[in-house]
């Protein structure tokens, strides 16, 4: 059935399953904004490796149904590229599979559960502008009954898994976007699944840093010479898309450093950085988190790292642009 699927790069960015060639598939969720992530499937000889589940059970079921229609291969391994819930909260729906993540990601996943997010959503109506923004970001997801299923295999550095005759290379590149980021490189398919090291046509969000690690990860991906690059969010891309994200990260680093050196506070710095070159990208308010993370990296011990403050800052920028 895979031959009947829309092929990259001919198809537009629409929801559903895409055949990437040689038994590799991607499942995309436009518009790629908050919570609308991508998954990947590598198949060979009746076996499959799944890269990431979705934010909730309904979206994960849709993804699994799409992949089953594309390939009957049995999912024997599930890789979670990092700790954010939109890449692992659906794990429990993948039965009888080894679940793999970096040790750093697995440690964080134990504390970042669906119940925690469901609690924030319940409280959001009484949280003013921050609550309004939180509902804007996450109100379309249903975490009812979403029991967390954590990785049972962890690694640091590199790990390989076989899928039939194919080798999948799991490469730790964090801390960058989060503390435990990894990518999945499939040389036989000339395809790399990057998790949230790549947001295509959307502003990346630097929860952890250092940003130099993220830039290095982009350069590593470019060096793999992959023909197809599946990001954590957004449409399938190539090396040019990777370079564009790398250049964004370098730009905000340099602009934030200029403002840090003048003594400007991080929120005002975030407000003042021109984003005209990235005007078509979604979720521009994430610049607030990125600048706060950069300021901490530069040595500002007062720059916030708590989610409540950072979501409040993003909410204010979101309101300003409405």
Can you describe what each PLM-predicted range is?
Residues 191, 213-272, 276:
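Divalent-metal (often Zn2+) His-rich catalytic cores of metallo-beta-lactamase-fold enzymes
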Residues 1-6, 262-322:
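C-terminal regulatory/interaction regions
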Residues 23, 42, 52, 67, ...:
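Divalent metal-coordination and catalytic microenvironments
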Residues 157-159, 163-221:
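Ligand/cofactor pocket segment of small-molecule handling proteins
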Residues 8, 19-20, 110-172, 188, ...:
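Metallo-beta-lactamase
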Residues 45-48, 58-101, 222-224:
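Active-site metal-binding motif and surrounding structural segment of the metallo-beta-lactamase
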Residues 17-66, 182-195:
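Conserved beta-strand hairpin/beta-sheet module of binuclear metal-dependent hydrolase folds
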Residues 51-53, 76-82, 100-102, 173-174, ...:
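Active-site neighborhood of phospho(di)ester-bond hydrolases with catalytic His/Asp-centered motifs
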